[in-house]
């Protein structure tokens, strides 16, 4: 491994919001590195290849992969279990199996990964930046471009400006939205959003929704993307009330497995509003990771500015403490 982003999803496992698989488990799911060895049955891969790891594997054969929805590949059923697709394990301590987070465990200096989770990238790319597209950037960008289907002239609200929300801002801006509205109570996150494409920022969702109505003749936003740190019922309800008729709420944030969504049924039917889930921003890793990195190389997607602090692996707990304190847009472990 060369680098790994500190994503909130790993923290969700420690809090129980996401059920962990086999414990103990080596975490990390947003990483990039250089191939040091290849096993059998891996044509097309060589020692020295530079790769971004995808926390969602793609078999290329199932219904979802064949339909262009690689993020829903059937192999993803093992993402939270910690084991390989054949039920075996690639890590152990004193003979005891160790689970691999998302099958890739990027919080390790070395890891064993199935080729289904590897995306080969340009060796000239800085891997400490490229690692971010493996989750946070791809998830946020795709939430705006793919799930919300942002278009020129639209009004898009992004609720929660962290490692995912900031990239939804970039995606909505790149798609040509006229009003890109970022919502976060932390001032430095609002300032960062303004520098990366947000046209307006607000500390509260109420203020953002009021502004959206003021610039759309009272209709509301075309889409509201929920990228809060921990999803709560009220987040979806607030987003739902902020969108226009036939508008879309994109739910990207992760909450407790028992968290429920409650919205007015009347508006759902008579206003034809839509609630759309988004896993990895409805992106297909093998297609969209290289594309996003090409955008980075051409200056249309900014990655360097996302990294607030870099850490050594031994300082991972400090990195997550900084995340909880609202100090980081994205922390990155550099090996």
Model-derived regions, located:
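Local beta-strand N-terminus motif with an aromatic residue
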Residues: 48, 153, 198, 220-221, ...
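Mid-domain Rossmann-like dinucleotide-binding core that forms the NAD(H)/NADP(H) cofactor-binding site
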Residues: 50, 109-110, 116-118, 122-210
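Glycine-rich cofactor phosphate-binding loops and adjacent beta1-alpha1 units
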Residues: 148-151, 187-274
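Cysteine-cluster motifs in flexible loop/terminal segments that predominantly coordinate metals
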Residues: 55-116
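Glycine-rich beta-strand-centered segment in the early N-terminal region that forms part
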Residues: 2-4, 17-66, 71, 79, ...
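Redox-cofactor binding/interface segments in oxidoreductases and associated redox assembly factors
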Residues: 2, 53, 158, 225-226, ...
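Cytochrome P450 core scaffold surrounding the K-helix E-X-X-R motif
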Residues: 9-14
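C-terminal hydrophobic helical "lid"/dimerization subdomain
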Residues: 206-207, 237-241, 282-335
């Amino acid at each position: 491994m060369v680098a790994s982003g500190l994503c909130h999803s790993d923290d969700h496992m420690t809090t129980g919001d996401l059920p962990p698989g086999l414990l103990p488990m080596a975490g990390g799911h947003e990483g990039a590195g250089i191939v040091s060895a290849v096993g059998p049955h891996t044509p097309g891969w060589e020692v020295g290849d530079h790769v971004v790891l995808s926390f969602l594997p793609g078999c290329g054969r199932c219904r979802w992969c064949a339909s262009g929805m690689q993020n829903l590949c059937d192999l993803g059923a093992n993402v939270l279990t910690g084991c390989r697709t054949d039920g075996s394990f690639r890590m152990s301590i004193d003979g005891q199996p160790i689970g691999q987070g998302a099958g890739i465990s990027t919080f390790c200096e070395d890891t064993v990964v199935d080729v289904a989770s590897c995306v080969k990238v340009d060796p000239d790319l800085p891997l400490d930046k490229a690692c971010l597209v493996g989750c946070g950037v791809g998830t946020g960008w795709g939430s705006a471009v793919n799930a919300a289907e942002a278009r020129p002239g639209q009004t898009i609200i992004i609720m929660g400006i962290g490692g995912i929300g900031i990239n939804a801002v970039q995606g909505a801006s790149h798609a040509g939205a006229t009003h890109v509205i970022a919502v976060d109570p932390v001032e430095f996150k609002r300032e960062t959003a303004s520098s990366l494409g947000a046209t307006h920022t607000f500390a509260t969702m109420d203020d953002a929704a009021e502004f959206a109505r003021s610039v759309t003749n009272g209709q509301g936003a075309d889409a509201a993307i929920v990228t809060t740190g921990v999803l709560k019922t009220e987040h979806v309800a607030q987003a739902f009330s902020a969108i226009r008729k036939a508008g879309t709420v994109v739910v990207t944030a992760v909450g407790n497995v028992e968290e429920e969504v409650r919205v007015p049924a009347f508006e759902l039917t008579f206003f034809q509003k839509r609630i759309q889930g988004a896993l990895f921003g409805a992106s297909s890793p093998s297609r969209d990771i290289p594309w996003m990195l090409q955008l980075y190389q051409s200056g249309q997607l900014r990655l360097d500015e996302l990294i607030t602090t870099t850490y050594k692996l031994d300082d991972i707990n400090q990195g997550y403490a900084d995340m909880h304190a609202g100090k980081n847009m994205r922390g990155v472990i550099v090996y």
